[in-house]
Amino acid sequence: MTELARKIVAGVGGADNIVSLMHCATRLRFKLKDESKAQAEVLKKTPGIIMVVESGGQFQVVIGNHVADVFLAVNSVAGLDEKAQQAPENDDKGNLLNRFVYVISGIFTPLIGLMAATGILKGMLALALTFQWTTEQSGTYLILFSASDALFWFFPIILGYTAGKRFGGNPFTAMVIGGALVHPLILTAFENGQKADALGLDFLGIPVTLLNYSSSVIPIIFSAWLCSILERRLNAWLPSAIKNFFTPLLCLMVITPVTFLLVGPLSTWISELIAAGYLWLYQAVPAFAGAVMGGFWQIFVMFGLHWGLVPLCINNFTVLGYDTMIPLLMPAIMAQVGAALGVFLCERDAQKKVVAGSAALTSLFGITEPAVYGVNLPRKYPFVIACISGALGATIIGYAQTKVYSFGLPSIFTFMQTIPSTGIDFTVWASVIGGVIAIGCAFVGTVMLHFITAKRQPAQGAPQEKTPEVITPPEQGGICSPMTGEIVPLIHVADTTFASGLLGKGIAILPSVGEVRSPVAGRIASLFATLHAIGIESDDGVEILIHVGIDTVKLDGKFFSAHVNVGDKVNTGDRLISFDIPAIREAGFDLTTPVLISNSDDFTDVLPHGTAQISAGEPLLSIIR
């Protein structure tokens, strides 16, 4: 992980070129000082990186489901610390759209997983009520519903923190302003203000428009922005001896009243206007809206434009109490699942089959980047078929005007979130039908087109015969075994990062002797600081990664000893690393050791030798050029 982090930091132009870094479910999202210093093409070819996307003012590196681990490694390697998670105070670069997407993604990205979790929990509770497994009066329901509803009820406080960080202000000051919006005294004043004989509320004689700000989104975002501006001015003007407490004091005294008097009513009016406008457009042509959103959603995601729609969805929940956009996106997700399953069925390469299968599984839960970038998009036609299938499914859902009643990532869980308080109705069944059509059409279309293209290839003229150059070990520069032990097929390795082949083709060994010896003549290209992995580049350009054990990076070098340094010249059979097998096993780690060809894409194929047991120095892999 550390080696991948080093390559990523180098690929984005070095630590000094990083302004800020955050991550979502599958991507590292960099804000760079100078994007021209980034080496996108180099990063795209780096094992462990699925894709690189430059969009929305961000340099995005698509990693996959283990992005959180890579984020921590990059943070450590680059020495970013808190800077990695904070936004710059001002971002004046890029066009208006890029700046908008950058701000919105920074505010909502940290909350997406939690919002999805609370949405799923609400859907499960709705399902339980529908089948009468519980009642609204039961303690179990009340406690779990409180957990599912708390995030949105106190949204102004939570968004105060993320918006405060994004705008470069003190996030805790913005949180307090958000807390004022949903304080019990304010909510009580709002309820009393609904009565016919209620007296109005004023601030220093200025009348206050009483509104319910629970679950609101836009007011606190504007307030956090204003607060950050005032805070910077005050920090510049006030003496350092008093600004630590006078700055937040003055911000609260100024911004809180301004929020209640001006920002809150104005932004609430804007929220209602946006919701009414969206509802009018949607109700005018719901089926067409479904076709557009279902067909183009994944394209929006590729370019990072989907972040501009997240506030719209959340605003719909705040103003309308439901959202009609998320149901339209669910078929787009299901279609990517179907296309990936089609590739899984048709693919003959065992490792690529594993990649397609695991990508389809993660897509079911709304994480489509592995399926899009690792499976469907590189093959082109599965991605196109998935977009068309998503449009078909979403057209049906749009026609039925299906709604969801809680926020969540478009996924298999969306079906539960479409259940209204009155129970399962036609709109729920429409979402099921739309999802099934999307996944079914994408699967069938991908399989059919695969067989059609496979039949046409021989008719295009027989290709010229080319005898592949096979490098067999050890005489002709092939790969010898670096260990003595039992051969394990790569697809049986417990870590899917290795098993999927994303880091390169190869084989694994369960060692019986605690030594790693050089499999080739060459030089040491890399040696991890924790000594659990080493990279060797052979004299004829084959790059080999030997990773001793699974998750052994957590040992932090304990039980490992290195006998070489980076840059050393080595011969076949030279001792590279020693390790204590009993101690590592006693610590609870799997010693299965992947031996990978990192630059597998440079060769026609990498073939393991068929043997169950092997000794160090015996033939292990053949490279076909």
From Swiss-Prot:
Its EC number is 2.7.1.-. Residues 121-140, 188-202, 266-284, 346-353, 402-403, 453-625 are cytoplasmic. Signal peptide: none annotated. InterPro entries: Dup_hybrid_motif, Glu_permease_IIB, PTrfase_EIIB_Cys, PTS_EIIA_1_perm, PTS_EIIC, PTS_EIIC_1, PTS_IIABC_b_glu, PTS_IIB_1. It is found in: Cell inner membrane. GO terms for cellular component: plasma membrane. Residues 1-99, 162-166, 224-244, 306-324, 375-380, 425-431 are periplasmic. The active site is at 24 (phosphocysteine intermediate), 547 (tele-phosphohistidine intermediate). GO terms for biological process: phosphoenolpyruvate-dependent sugar phosphotransferase system; trehalose transport. One of its GO terms (molecular function) is kinase activity. It is a multi-pass membrane protein. It holds the Pfam family PTS_EIIB. The keyword Transmembrane helix applies. Residues 495-599 form the PTS EIIA type-1 domain. Residues 102-465 form the PTS EIIC type-1 domain. The keyword Transit peptide does not apply. Keywords: Cell inner membrane, Cell membrane, Kinase, Membrane, Phosphotransferase system, Sugar transport, Transferase, Transmembrane, Transmembrane helix, Transport. Residues 1-84 form the PTS EIIB type-1 domain. The chain crosses the membrane at residues 100-120, 141-161, 167-187, 203-223, 245-265, 285-305, 325-345, 354-374, 381-401, 404-424, 432-452. NCBIfam families: EIIB_glc, PRK09824.1, PTBA, pts-Glc, PTS-II-ABC-beta. The EIIB domain is phosphorylated by phospho-EIIA on a cysteinyl or histidyl residue, depending on the transported sugar. Then, it transfers the phosphoryl group to the sugar substrate concomitantly with the sugar uptake processed by the EIIC domain. The EIIC domain forms the PTS system translocation channel and contains the specific substrate-binding site. PANTHER family: PHOSPHOTRANSFERASE SYSTEM TRANSPORT PROTEIN, PTS SYSTEM ARBUTIN-, CELLOBIOSE-, AND SALICIN-SPECIFIC EIIBC COMPONENT-RELATED. The phosphoenolpyruvate-dependent sugar phosphotransferase system (sugar PTS), a major carbohydrate active -transport system, catalyzes the phosphorylation of incoming sugar substrates concomitantly with their translocation across the cell membrane. This system is involved in beta-glucoside transport. This is PTS system beta-glucoside-specific EIIBCA component. It comes from Escherichia coli (strain K12). The lineage of its organism: Bacteria, Pseudomonadati, Pseudomonadota, Gammaproteobacteria, Enterobacterales. The gene is bglF.
